Amino acid sequence: MILVVGLGNPGSRYADTRHNIGFRVADELASRAKVESWRSRFSGDFALTAMGSERLALLKPGTFMNVSGRSVRPAASFYKLDLDRVVVVHDELDLPFGQIRLKLGGGDAGHNGLRSITSELGSSDYVRLRFGIGHPPEDFGGSGADYVLQAFAPAELAELGARVGAAADAVELVVRRGLTAAMNTTNQRKRDN
């Protein structure tokens, strides 16, 4: 089994923000797997399905981003998953909009959701799918925290569906072919563009 965690904040106020890109990718995966409904479990929205021969658990924490680990740890523990079977999809300021990178382990780069998950799991050795949202424009008057809680720009929205699809493709590669093959394909593809 692989647990895919899409990070975001609960509630309609945050639904269209950059910080909720993980929820969008989880929803795309659920759609592809023909998940008919989510259920409330592990302090979030949860679905069990399959992708090929692999069992797949999808989780959208219902906690706020800064305490996402309170949802992730119970799910990973319940299914007795090794951390390399946990894939966390999150927004990444340090990548240009729509760029995707897969990696195993690493620091939190100031991302409070990752910080919480690492703290709760007691390790950072889980898989991350980093979805680029870019840095705020120079004329942006707020902080990075303000930026991630804003909606995507119109030009970004025009490309968002395709980019979310590419992120879901990358997760599918992890599930079907393993992390190394998925990293080789996904991370190389982005270098070529």
What name fits each language-model region?
Residues 2-105, 114-130, 137-146, 150, ...:
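Nucleotide and nucleotide-moiety/phosphate-recognizing core
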